[in-house]
Amino acid sequence: SQHQELPVSISKSQAYMSGNSAVLSLFDMARQEMAQGQYEACLIGGVESYFHADTMEWLDTNKQLLGSVSRAGFVPAEGAGFCLVMTPTAAQQAGLRPIALIHNTATAWESKLIKTQEMNFGEALIESVRATVAGLDASRDRIHSIYCDINGERYRGEEWGFTCLKLAQYFDDPTGYCSPADCWGDMGAASGALFVGLATQAALRGYASGKRSLLWTSSENGLRTAALLEADVIPSPYRG
């Protein structure tokens, strides 16, 4: 970043290897540290690539690749995404207009991991989503959109199914989620940042169904994360 003349402090940069939940867990960390006055702005991003021989062999051995051997596998992908998170004061001083507000975030740890014999009832995902939506009035503050890393693996889908049973009252339609892995494959550690991009662009381009979006991710190591975004929907002249 110094070579590109970006105002980023290399000495304060940190790298985390937390899988799919990396970015949203860093949102949670940044939100808390910024509230404590430690930082005014954080650049948070995720980079992922499954396209290495050892990684592909590992996925194939565990029957996680979508194909004739496993119909409940996923399509691997690679990508990157970054988000600039700032306090309202810092954004105002920089002359920037935020395109979304991080209303709340939460993390939890699942002990019943994928590729084990233990039954997973979505306890950690339920915990993280419940904590994220805790400040909403379910009767009027509905969540309009859901972006998640459901990727075709039954384990992931079942987690959200149990969450729907517990927290359906907060959503317009808890089963009407957007799972971008259907289109671009599983983006792994880049997922959270890319979901932010999808949610904010839907609002900016006028096709979002409302201003509130829940983002959630699930890592193989048990980390579960959720974030509630609010972005004003700009009416589109091309949509009635």
Per-range role (PLM):
Residues 43-45, 83-85, 147, 214:
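Structural motif
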Residues 53-56, 157-158, 225:
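Short glycine-/acidic-enriched loop or helix-start segments at secondary-structure transitions
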Residues 60-138, 144, 221, 230-240:
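Condensing-enzyme catalytic core mediating Claisen C-C bond formation in acyl metabolism
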Residues 20-21, 47-51, 106-110, 150-151, ...:
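Acidic, glycine-rich active-site loops and adjacent beta-strand->loop/helix elements
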